[in-house]
Amino acid sequence: MSYSRFLTVIVAYALSVMTALAAPPESLRTWFVDSLIKVFPADAPGTHRLVTPEFWCARNQQVSVQLAVRSVAPVPGMTVEVPPLEMRSGGKIADVRVRRVGYVIVGSHTPDTPPEELVGEAPGWYPDPLLDFPLDLEARRTHAVWVTVRVPAEARAGIYRGAIHLRAGNRLVASAPFRLRVAAATVPEQRSLKVTNWFGLDDKVSRQFYGVPAFSEEWWTLVENVARVMADHRQNVILTPLMELIQPRVVGSEIRYDFANFDRWVETFKRAGAIGYIEGGHLLGRGGESYEGSLEIPTFQLAGGQIRKESLPADDPRVEQFLASFLGALNAHLEEKGWKSIYFQHILDEAHGPEPPYYKKFAEVVHRYLPGIPTMDAVDAAHMPEELQENCDIWVPQLGRFDDQMDLLRRRIDSGHEVWFYTCLVPNGRYLNRLLDYPLLKVRLLHWVNFRHNLVGFLHWGGNYWTPEPMKDTQPVINANTTLLPAGDAFIMYPDRANKSVLSSIRFEAMREGIEDYELLRLLKTKNPAEANRLAEAAIVSFTEYVRDPVAFRKLQRELLEALAK
């Protein structure tokens, strides 16, 4: 290429950039969209536009405000700011966080689900992770600004006015005013709904996604940051990997246990506000990475003065010898720390087929060596053999498997036992779930199910079980590469390597708001049980019939807040 031709190309490129930076404000469109509606890149200007951008909330609640943005010309380096919201009489809300909604790839739709229960097109780009600004806004590609307003518990009730300001460099390109109506009702600080999203931060995960080894000081910083995100989303039950945290030591001719890492883990989550409860990891697993694999129990074995970690068959007599020592030491330590009252113990996830007798056997071991500690596990309410009914203390049945078993669950609840529920890769169809190609209202309503049916906890297995590139691959393969998971099932958070933390998602935000709804419904039940039940029954008619229209849901939300304010 000649020098003159090269210079021409460079000048043309510079002019194009300057033109983009100088794009007139009228080329950029903004409109508010209910935060329960997903904004897609192909959305035309005005899609799902809120006519009146006024948002209701309680005190001590986090409120999501979503603004869609689209431009006919690129806008590089876009930033957003939201000044403190103010009342005309002088009240102010200053705790405001601004993020942008990123897009991830969904390769295929959730199977066995009617088209009307899905959103978006697969394969395609779906909104989910919440990322920091700036944003290089491409031409004719819609993005969403996500504003989180944290309303103080002491905020005055009334209308607060705010605005979202969009800038390209130092130039203001758009402003979008909105109102926040704070009701005279307060989300309780006490977190009564027990909530767990299983997650892992073992050495493999921490090295792969964060570049730090487990138990290094950088790793403990990561753990603390993750704990804060968990607490911020009202997660209060923390899966605790016993075999990784509790370290065996040779003392004389015996194995003794060092609880220093276990203690630091628990205390880190307690300090962040995420414990709550300690959820002891499963004692039994399955071999071959298969759901039908034979049962195996990881143990520590002493041979030749050396400790090795060894998985043994369930019938091996060394298993109970190990558990007697390990659980006995754990029990003594929990008593010493005063943590027995906040501890649950898993035995085996989803015991099925020939496994329930083994569940009974090892539940008896747990009850013997951890006296007073409840066992809890995911179970199939449609198939509850006696071994599970009598030996699993806290039942966690799967949504979609207990429609016809509510009498069984009510009897269990009436007898004084806790019953939770869980979702995973199923249910699908017309049920609620937190999958990427499902509407966000399905996520929020999960915790209305908790209230509606007196189910006091919620469990999901997929907090952060990431693929190697979670932004590009949202569907891991499990069961020895035989099962493709639905999009979003395996994780609801994303790795944040730069900050040694995790990124939230719009699904995680909707989940928190559903948990806040649960607490408000529970509060209303102490004041007006008939109204609390009416609202819950209007929202959740059955497990497959529930409010699907965000406008109708917002009406119920307002009625809830107004009832509490009386």
Language model feature labels by segment:
Residues 438-491:
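Substrate-binding cleft of secreted/luminal carbohydrate-active enzymes
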Residues 119, 126, 131-135, 149-150, ...:
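Aromatic-lined carbohydrate-binding surfaces of glycoside hydrolases
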Residues 7-18:
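Bacterial N-terminal signal peptides
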Residues 307, 311-359, 364-381, 471-566:
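Catalytic domains of carbohydrate-active enzymes that cleave complex glycans
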Residues 72, 150-157:
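Short, surface-exposed loop/turn segments at beta-strand-coil junctions that are enriched for proline
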Residues 24-49, 72-147:
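Surface-exposed binding patches on compact interaction domains or structured appendages
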Residues 413-444:
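Active-site clefts of carbohydrate-active enzymes
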Residues 49, 60-66, 143-144, 156-163:
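Short, solvent-exposed loop/turn segments enriched in Ser/Thr/Gly
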